[in-house]
Amino acid sequence: MSRRVISVNILMLIATAGSVAQTDNQDPTITDLQRQIQEMRLQMAKMQNRIAELETTRGIAATNSGADPVLLQSETHPTQALQSQPGETKSSEEPTSFHYKGLTLTPGGFLEGTMLLRTRNENADIANSYSAIPLNGSSNAKLSEFRGSARNSELSLLVQGTAGSTKLKGYVEADFLGAAPTANYVESNSWTPRLRQLWVQLDKPSGWTITAGQTWSLLTTNQQGIASLAELRPGGEDGQYVVGFTWTRQRAFRVTKNFNNKVWTAFAVEEPETTYSAAFVPANIMGLNTSPNAATGVNLLPFLPNYSSGFSTNLAPDLLAKVAFEPGWGHFEIKALGRFFRDRIASTATTNGHTNTTEGYGLGFGALMPFANKKLDVSLEGLLGQGIGRYGSSGLPDATINPTTGALRPLREARIMGGFVYHHRSRLDLYAYGGDEYAGRDAFISPTGTAAGYGSPLVSYASCTNEVAMNGCGGANRNIYEATAGYWYRLYRGEFGRIEQGNQVVYIHRNLWSGIGTTPQGSDVVVYTSLRFYLP
């Protein structure tokens, strides 16, 4: 019932009550009518209060949905959250929200069933292990791999409200890529939920926004402004996204300023962690994720076998800054990263200990550019610096170790990724991406005369041509690159949500730094097919 109809009914009730009251003055015998009139007046007062509450709630919902359209839909495909596709009519019930004590709650996410076939056995689930693609001489390079998985399904809840002129938001998102010690593919397939995002946000009308919690890194390119839930993710089915994609999800405290929806600036302090690779590790070294003093018990990245279950001992948070521009066409970003690395050589009965500290940095860019009347969206991003490895999909190491002093040495690294999404029809999106990640050589000779550092030319590849002896085949990744393409086809879109079917083909190539003997390489081709149901 509209407010206008309710108001007319109230006026009619008032007029009737007045008429009855006048009759009552003329005829004192109808005291029962006086009681009924009083009850009607109380009911009308309650109705007016209820109308005011409904109008306030509707106003809050309209304000939230109008000011931040991106926040009402967590999409997987780039740009879909920001614009309707040609020929599509959105249901008035989408997205479906409900209200509780002045708050607007919006559930989201998708349920997915995926099958994949790899030409090389990575021993991985839905996420590719880019830095561990089997080398050509290994048994895994001669075995294919089939997997089926529902673990990439995501569930989320967005909570919005207002306190005076301040908008309040909270968001939680989870998938099922966690793995308890008893998780397996044998019988029950009992995979555990995994936290992806959990944050709170205060948004002031002056353009200031404060975000705290676990979220996508500020280094991740956005689709619009510098807004949470507007990250520009590659649109495929690979759980590790694309080689060259810059991202983490981690604890952060971020402050953002919006200047008239044209320019945005942001600064963040985010959770640090150090990954390393070294052909020689000095004795008694502390502070690394494999050191005796490291905290253990949590598997950080279960689909990347290079990582241990320890945590590095960190000196300070990573410092990040970003400026975003939207001059009227496209979205453009400049971003920067500062990092701090530390380890320690422990003292012994005959030697003194010492602590080593060094810094890393990164400078990058991002862009999203629409063409062909917004039917074609082209994206490009890159990052260059020292010690930036863990911020990329390939998981290249941040640093190596000086064999003499034990000091961490941030590696020279670079990455780039580009791609496009073509909205061919209202039901069909076509996409393609390519990316490359590189880690520079930083080689030494150890005190014992052996190979040390990262990418040492003294590393022997003699065992890399023997399938049985491949366990002794070691080397440092020089670069990893990928090319991928696929599509998403919307089978249904309406008040019950939407159902999409997608296929993706991935080619990955892994190069090692040269050593003694023929340098091995690795490559893999992966084919995905998925069916997804997005919640309305």
How would you name each of these model-derived features?
Residues V20-I126:
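N-terminal periplasmic/intermembrane-space "pro-region" immediately following the signal or transit peptide
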Residues G522-P536:
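Outer-membrane beta-barrel "beta-signal"
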Residues S92-A283, T313-H331, M369-L384, I388-R390:
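Outer membrane beta-barrel
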Residues Y100, F146-N152, S188-L195, G244-T248, ...:
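Transmembrane beta-barrel outer-membrane domains
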Residues N121-I126, T182-S190, Q223-A230, S277-M286, ...:
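Outer-membrane beta-barrel translocator domains and adjoining extracellular loop/strand segments
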Residues P327-A483:
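Detector for outer-membrane/organellar transmembrane beta-barrel domains
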Residues K169-G178, I334-F340, E437, Q504-Y507:
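Transmembrane beta-strand segments that form the barrel wall of outer-membrane beta-barrel proteins
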Residues S2-V20:
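Gram-negative bacterial Sec-dependent N-terminal signal peptides
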